[in-house]
């Protein structure tokens, strides 16, 4: 998260929300740390969650989508894409979801 955009309290709140989100997705330990550590990642994860909630009303379905293979990502699930490509992978997932919402 770029500190110039947000104050310390906002950064802390976003990080906590992203950590809770990742836990709801069933991601733990090193994988959760990998998703959360780095500038811009909490905001990207929250953007992904927002987009998924626009598409799916059921939070269990959201968690299943994150871990399901997706042809749009070459058969890789969104979670693996985000773990492998970091922030760039998160941005790709978010862009895909936003395009799905817009279509």
Describe the predicted segments one by one.
Residues 1-103:
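Non-transmembrane "mature" sequence context
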């Amino acid at each position: 998260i770029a500190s110039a955009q947000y104050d310390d309290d906002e950064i802390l709140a976003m990080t906590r929300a992203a950590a809770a989100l990742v836990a709801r997705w069933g991601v733990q330990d090193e994988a959760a740390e990998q998703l959360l550590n780095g500038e811009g990642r909490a905001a990207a994860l929250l953007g992904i969650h927002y987009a998924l909630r626009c598409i799916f009303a059921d939070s269990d379905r959201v968690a299943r989508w994150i871990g399901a293979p997706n042809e749009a990502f070459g058969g890789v699930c969104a979670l693996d894409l985000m773990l492998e490509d970091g922030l760039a992978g998160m941005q790709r997932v978010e862009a895909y979801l936003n395009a799905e919402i817009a279509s």
